[in-house]
C-alpha cells in the first residue's frame, strides 16, 4: 500500500511538472499575442492594462459617453510591440518600467533576454514609453541600437528641466547607440518612419510592411474612432494631433493595414474596414 501511495504521488508530481513545463513552453501569457501580417510578425506585449478616464477627454458630451458605454472609463492598455521583419527583431517602446511593469517577464516568456534586443524604436519620449529603458541608473537594453525622431529629441532636450529630466537622463544613458531620424527615413528592417506629430512634437508611427505601429495616435479607441477630433489632455499640440490622427487612420484604412497602438484595448490590434 505504501508503495502504491508513493508511486501515485510521484505520478502526480511528474504530471504537475509536465503541465507547468507545457504551460511555460506552449501557452503564452494573456498579455501576449502574435499576428503574422504579410512578411511581418508582430507580437503585442501588454506592459500594463487599465481604462482611460473619460475626464481626460474634456468637452465630450455625457450623452455620447453614455451611448458608447464608456462613461465609467474607456478600455485601453499600456502596450509595446515586438516586430520580426527581414531577419531583424525590433522592440517598439518600453512601457512604464516601474513596479507592475510586465515587459521584461513577457519577453522572458518568449525566450528573449534584455541583452537580446538589438533594435529599439521609440514612438515618442513620454514616460510610459521610455520608462523601461532604465532601471535606476542602469541601462536595461545594453545591446540595443536606439532610433528616435530628431524632431522629438531636439524638442525634449530644449524643454525645462522639470519636464524633460527623465528624457535627458535616458537619452544620455544610450547616447553611444542613439540614432536620430527624419520623418520619411527608412530604418533597419525596411521600416518607414511616418510623421504622426501632435501628441508630442516628433511623435512617430512606423510602417512595417502591412503593419503600422501607431504609437499614441488614439488613447480612447471607442471614443476617438467615432470622434477623431477629440483629444486627450496628453496631446501637446491638439490641432496637429487631430490632423495626424485623421491622416493615419485614413492611410491605414485605405491600405488595409493592421494598426498597432500603444493604448488600444487588449489585444492592441485594430484593422479598419474599407
Residue map of PLM features:
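Bacterial N-terminal signal peptides that target proteins for export
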Residues: 1-8
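Boundary at the C-terminal end of the N-terminal hydrophobic targeting segment
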Residues: 20-23
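Conserved beta-strand hairpin/beta-sheet module of binuclear metal-dependent hydrolase folds
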Residues: 28-109, 205-218
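Metallo-beta-lactamase
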Residues: 36, 116, 143-195, 200, ...
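Active-site HxH/HxHxD metal-binding segment of metal-dependent hydrolases
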Residues: 53-54, 95-176
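Active-site neighborhood of phospho(di)ester-bond hydrolases with catalytic His/Asp-centered motifs
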Residues: 91-94, 118-128, 147-149, 195-198, ...
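Active-site environment of divalent metal-dependent phosphoester hydrolases
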Residues: 99, 125-132, 200-204, 219-223, ...
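Cap/insert and terminal regions of metallo-dependent hydrolase folds
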Residues: 210-274
Amino acid at each position: 500500500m505504501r508503495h502504491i501511495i508513493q508511486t501515485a504521488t510521484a505520478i502526480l508530481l511528474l504530471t504537475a511538472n509536465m503541465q507547468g513545463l507545457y504551460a511555460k513552453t506552449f501557452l503564452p501569457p494573456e498579455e501576449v499575442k502574435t499576428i503574422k501580417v504579410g512578411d511581418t510578425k508582430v507580437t503585442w506585449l501588454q506592459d500594463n492594462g487599465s481604462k482611460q478616464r473619460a475626464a481626460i477627454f474634456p468637452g465630450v458630451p455625457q450623452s455620447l459617453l453614455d451611448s458608447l458605454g464608456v462613461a465609467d472609463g474607456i478600455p485601453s492598455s499600456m502596450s509595446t510591440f515586438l516586430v520580426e521583419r527581414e531577419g531583424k527583431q525590433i522592440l517598439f517602446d518600453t512601457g512604464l518600467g516601474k513596479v507592475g511593469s510586465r515587459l521584461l517577464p513577457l519577453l522572458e516568456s518568449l525566450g528573449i533576454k534584455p541583452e537580446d534586443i538589438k533594435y529599439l524604436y521609440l514612438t515618442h519620449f513620454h514616460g510610459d514609453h521610455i520608462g523601461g529603458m532604465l532601471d535606476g541608473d542602469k541601462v536595461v537594453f545594453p545591446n540595443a541600437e536606439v532610433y528616435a525622431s530628431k524632431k522629438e529629441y531636439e524638442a525634449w532636450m530644449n524643454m525645462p528641466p522639470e519636464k524633460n529630466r527623465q528624457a535627458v537622463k535616458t537619452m544620455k544613458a544610450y547616447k553611444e547607440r542613439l540614432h536620430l531620424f527624419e520623418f520619411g527615413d527608412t530604418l533597419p528592417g525596411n521600416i518607414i518612419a511616418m510623421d504622426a506629430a501632435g501628441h508630442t512634437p516628433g511623435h512617430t508611427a512606423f510602417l512595417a510592411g502591412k503593419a503600422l505601429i501607431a504609437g499614441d495616435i488614439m488613447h480612447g479607441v471607442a471614443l476617438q474612432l467615432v470622434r477623431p477630433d477629440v483629444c486627450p489632455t496628453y496631446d501637446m499640440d491638439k490641432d496637429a494631433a487631430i490632423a495626424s490622427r485623421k491622416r493615419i487612420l485614413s492611410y491605414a484604412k485605405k491600405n488595409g493595414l493592421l494598426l498597432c497602438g500603444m493604448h488600444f484595448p487588449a489585444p492592441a490590434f485594430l484593422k479598419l474596414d474599407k
